[in-house]
């Protein structure tokens, strides 16, 4: 019998240096960073604005526009393959389906002219062509993220929902692709504190339920205590501290 693969990290980033090259010069966005993520684990990447944390998240599926981004050194191993060596077609298959994102502003990620149903259905049809009853899937994921009356609400347009509800829809859309890793970049910054707590709590529950891994990118140390297994602290493009959440926060 084969040895258990659980010790093998799902994601293994090694010595990653990314520069932005523009007419006004070169910015070192990340400087030789290394970190890993195991299956079912939550890693918080914490740092102030400009620390390189969002760049790191986007780099995982090469979402940074190239140019200006240049991958100077390093490897990003996901499921044993280096993302930096994948073809455009392989990258498209990776994005959403295996590694999905929730961004800070749901209003910019949701299309105002389509119903909630259409937007989630499109994600499901793209990444899971085998699903026969798409509407049932849409209802299932809206229900999962705590939207009441999902059957009615799925016919709403984004502007008919509150900010917190829009963010839940974004999470439902990301989860409906059944990703291995959910990258949540400041997923609750725009929301009030109570709603922030609810959504973080929801993510923790869903992680258990769907046995996925989460990378939570945030500037807010306050929200990571209850959700992250490990923390990587970024400062000016470097990881300056990394460890179990308990030891880093104390």
Each language-model region and where it sits:
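Helical segment within the ABC ATPase nucleotide-binding domain
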Residues: 197-211, 222
């Amino acid at each position: 019998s084969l040895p258990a693969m659980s010790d093998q990290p799902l994601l293994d980033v090694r010595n990653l240096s990314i520069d932005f090259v523009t007419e006004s010069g070169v910015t070192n966005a990340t400087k030789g960073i290394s970190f890993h993520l195991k299956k079912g684990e939550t890693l918080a990447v914490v740092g102030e604005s400009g620390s390189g944390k969002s760049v790191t998240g986007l780099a995982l599926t090469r979402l940074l526009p190239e140019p200006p981004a240049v991958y100077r050194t390093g490897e990003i191993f996901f499921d044993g393959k280096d993302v930096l060596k994948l073809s455009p077609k392989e990258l498209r298959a990776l994005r959403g389906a295996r590694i999905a994102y929730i961004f800070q502003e749901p209003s910019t990620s949701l299309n105002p002219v389509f119903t909630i149903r259409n937007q989630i259905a499109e994600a499901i049809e793209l990444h899971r062509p085998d699903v026969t009853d798409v509407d049932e899937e849409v209802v299932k994921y809206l229900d999962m993220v705590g939207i009441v009356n999902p059957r009615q609400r799925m016919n709403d347009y984004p502007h008919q929902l509150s900010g917190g509800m829009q963010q839940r829809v974004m999470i439902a859309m990301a989860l409906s692709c059944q990703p291995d890793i959910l990258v949540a970049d400041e997923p609750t910054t725009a929301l009030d504190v109570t709603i922030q707590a609810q959504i973080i709590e929801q993510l923790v529950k869903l992680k258990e339920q769907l046995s996925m891994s989460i990378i939570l990118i945030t500037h807010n140390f306050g929200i990571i205590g209850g959700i992250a297994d490990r923390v990587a602290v970024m400062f000016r493009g470097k990881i300056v501290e990394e460890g179990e959440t308990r030891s880093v926060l104390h």
